[in-house]
């Protein structure tokens, strides 16, 4: 009897051990599935066309763009110049900014009209912004809200978190109006942060006459702030600092870096410091940032594997993976070359983003068309080095495959576009009254593709442009679904030497499990 109890006790202990191992395996699998994923539930991204639909009747069909007859379901921005001329960097050797008055009309439950009580009323500096876009007829505006004493006026705008710096983007070459909106919002669901964006309609007022400027987006500019790029504030008494950098054209008006990659011709274009500001950054802090970037670049462009494999000590790998996937999916050929941001917190690693400037994405680049059956982003600075690592390539493709089941699926993208176009409604036609002649211009160069076929990308109607976006995304995604890994893995030089610690633990538990099973059966 005593022996039977002992046998039962031993058997129970063995079963308990097996159960413990099985639970451990389940936990390992769950944790493994979570690794590399970014939880954005707390970000609560607002999509204007979904979340800000007003309970109004269907009277927003008027095409009247006079101040007396105008009404819209979108917010209205009035730029009161009091007769001053808005300028750009091309118009003066000094500071092109002038101070104007800005009103934003954004009624909660009715259409918005000129003369309604403004939700926001502020002084603001303004200038024309952009590079090539400075030459377009429809201008873009950089705004900085100010108090009467000249200090920053940090204000909530159209439901976006309070800030002082804003961009009014007119997207003259984007005949669809929607490329930036789609890319920013979907990136905002995937990455830690992407600029929030709202559609609005804009009027210029010179003190006497209101002039309709068309359909715009109000966008959060990229700056250090709690609800934007949330890095530690710069302390001028310290050499080390958080920073925000941008890859773009060389500019004498910005603080440029002479980092290892640039000086040695390993990367394209130039890196400039966006934060800390030129007015505050010390020479010592500038040198610190330059050295910090150079140290990372020496690692990824090293021919020594022992050095190269330490790159994960310097960067937030997941952010680089997401940045690769988003820009490749949307065919943003300018990313990695221009308007390419990265940031680093004082206590963190170098992080890619936020995303910016998708006017030329989705087969809208002026000098070349999107090649559906090719991967372009693999040649971008820094990324052309990272894809030497098999593990990085596998992370990129795994993340892409994961997102193709949700935010990057054909079904999600098509429905998103259709609902957005429906939401914009008559605002598209009002804008067309002023800027519709863009459809008559050959704005996109019809270059010969690698098959010798010349494809005319200049469409005649808005509806054709929307279909062109969908088709470009579908074709490119179809290629990536089949060939993404094969395409980017062609330059792999380094295969992982060791399995991750998580996989080691899984193997250990599995091996232990089978040993115990064999032991129990022998008993």
List each model region and its residues.
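N-terminal module-boundary/linker segments of secreted carbohydrate-active enzymes
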Residues: 35-111, 116, 495-496
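Short, solvent-exposed loop/turn and secondary-structure capping segments
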Residues: 89-92, 113-115, 154-157, 179-180, ...
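Conserved oxyanion/phosphate-binding beta-strand-loop segments in alpha/beta enzyme cores
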Residues: 112-170, 288
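Internal "kinase-insert"/substrate-recognition segments embedded within catalytic cores
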Residues: 149-150, 161-166, 170, 192-195, ...
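Short, well-structured beta-strand/strand-turn elements
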Residues: 190-202, 332
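Beta-rich nucleic-acid/ligand-interaction surfaces
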Residues: 199-211
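A conserved alpha-helical element in kinase catalytic cores
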Residues: 172-193
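Middle-to-C-terminal accessory/interaction subdomains
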Residues: 28-39, 132, 273-337, 345-505, ...
């Amino acid at each position: 009897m005593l022996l039977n109890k002992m046998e039962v006790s031993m058997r129970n202990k063995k079963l308990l051990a097996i159960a413990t191992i099985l639970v451990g395996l389940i936990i390992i699998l769950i944790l493994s599935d979570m690794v590399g994923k970014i939880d954005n539930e707390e970000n609560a991204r607002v999509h204007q066309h979904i979340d800000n639909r007003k309970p109004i009747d269907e009277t927003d069909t008027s095409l009247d763009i006079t101040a007396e007859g105008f009404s819209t379901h979108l917010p209205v921005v009035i730029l009161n110049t009091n007769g001053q001329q808005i300028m750009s960097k091309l118009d003066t050797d000094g500071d092109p900014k002038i101070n104007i008055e800005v009103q934003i009309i954004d009624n909660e439950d009715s259409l918005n009209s000129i003369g309604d009580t403004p939700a926001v009323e502020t002084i603001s500096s303004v200038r024309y912004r952009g590079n090539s876009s400075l030459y377009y007829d429809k201008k873009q505006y950089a705004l900085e809200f100010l108090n009467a004493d000249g200090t920053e006026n940090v204000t909530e705008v159209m439901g976006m978190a309070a800030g002082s710096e804003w961009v009014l983007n007119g997207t003259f070459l984007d005949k669809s109006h929607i490329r930036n909106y789609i890319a920013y919002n979907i990136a905002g669901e995937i990455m830690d942060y992407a600029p929030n964006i709202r559609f609005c309609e804009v009027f210029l007022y010179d003190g006497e006459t209101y002039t309709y400027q068309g359909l715009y987006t109000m966008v959060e500019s990229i700056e250090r702030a709690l609800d934007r790029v949330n890095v530690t504030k710069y302390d001028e008494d310290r050499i080390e600092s958080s920073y925000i950098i941008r890859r773009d054209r060389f500019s004498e008006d910005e603080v440029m870096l002479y980092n290892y990659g640039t000086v040695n011709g390993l990367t394209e274009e130039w890196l400039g410091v966006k934060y800390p500001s030129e007015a505050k950054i010390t020479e010592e802090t500038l040198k610190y940032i330059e050295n910090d970037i150079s140290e990372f670049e020496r690692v990824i462009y090293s021919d020594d594997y022992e050095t190269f494999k330490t790159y994960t000590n310097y960067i937030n790998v997941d952010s680089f993976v997401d940045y690769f996937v988003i820009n490749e999916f949307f065919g943003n050929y300018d990313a990695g070359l221009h308007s390419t941001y990265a940031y680093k917190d004082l206590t963190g690693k170098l992080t890619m983003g936020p995303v910016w400037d998708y006017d030329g994405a989705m087969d809208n680049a002026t000098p070349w068309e999107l090649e559906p059956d090719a991967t372009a982003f693999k040649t971008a600075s820094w990324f052309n080095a990272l894809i030497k690592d098999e593990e990085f390539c596998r992370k990129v493709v795994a993340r892409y495959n994961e997102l193709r089941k949700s935010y990057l699926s054909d079904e999600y993208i098509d429905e998103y576009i259709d609902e957005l176009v429906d939401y914009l409604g008559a605002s598209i036609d009002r804008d067309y009254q002023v800027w519709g002649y863009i459809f008559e211009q050959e704005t996109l160069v019809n270059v010969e593709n690698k098959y010798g076929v010349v494809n005319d990308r200049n469409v005649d109607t808005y509806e054709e442009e929307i279909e062109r976006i969908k088709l470009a995304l579908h074709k490119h995604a179809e290629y990536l679904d089949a060939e993404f890994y094969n395409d980017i893995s062609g330059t792999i030089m380094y295969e992982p030497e060791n399995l991750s610690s998580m996989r080691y633990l899984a193997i250990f538990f599995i091996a232990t499990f089978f040993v115990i099973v064999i032991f129990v059966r022998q008993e």
